[in-house]
């Protein structure tokens, strides 16, 4: 029985890796996501090195793909929060207008994060592929509810 479960798990993992995390688009500009790399096994494997459990690693990977799909071709930054223990989606700020070089949650969105029993993982993008800003670092250091903060760049670079 254990062999069947392991085979099923391996098949499931293989199928997940074969599916594109971000779709192809016809137009490209300076803010376009590097689709080929983002859809690669090498990119997926970066998430397996994160210091969280496998379910959370996979959730971070999926939410990062969803984030990059949303901002592909745009200079604005957006953000997603997930539960750091379960990987469950908490909130994102995709529904409103974004800003270039900064992002934040509204008070109502942040309240959803504060209501979480567990710590959270924040994921946001840097469309110009830059390192985490001073504000990114301060937010992470000053909010004890944040377990992990990830910056996903459009070129496939990840900062944690």
Protein language model regions, located:
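Active-site-proximal loop/helix of nucleotide/amide-processing enzymes and allied scaffolds
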Residues: 2-46, 104-160
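Short, basic/aromatic recognition patches
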Residues: 55-69
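Short, flexible loop/turn motifs enriched in small residues
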Residues: 71-77
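Short beta-strand scaffold segments in enzyme catalytic cores
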Residues: 77-85, 149-152
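Short glycine-rich, polar/acidic loop-and-turn segments at beta strand-coil junctions
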Residues: 85, 94-96, 124-126
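Residue-level signal for well-ordered, solvent-exposed loop/turn and beta-edge residues enriched
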Residues: 87-88, 157
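Active-site-proximal segments of catalytic enzyme domains
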Residues: 90, 95-112
């Amino acid at each position: 029985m254990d062999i069947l479960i392991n085979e099923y798990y391996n098949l499931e993992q293989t199928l997940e890796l074969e599916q594109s995390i971000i779709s192809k688009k016809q137009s490209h500009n300076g803010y376009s996501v590097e689709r080929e790399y983002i859809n690669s096994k090498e990119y997926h494997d970066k998430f397996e090195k994160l210091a969280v459990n496998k379910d959370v690693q996979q959730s971070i990977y999926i939410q990062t793909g969803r984030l990059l799909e949303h901002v592909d071709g745009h200079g604005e930054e957006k953000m997603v929060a997930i539960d750091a223990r379960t990987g469950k989606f908490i909130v994102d700020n995709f529904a409103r207008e974004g800003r270039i070089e900064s992002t934040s949650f509204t008070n109502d969105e942040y309240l959803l994060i504060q209501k979480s029993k567990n710590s959270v993982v924040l994921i946001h993008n840097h469309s110009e592929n830059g390192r985490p800003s001073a504000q990114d670092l301060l937010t992470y250091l000053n909010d004890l509810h944040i377990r992990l903060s990830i910056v996903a760049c459009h070129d496939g670079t990840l900062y944690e």
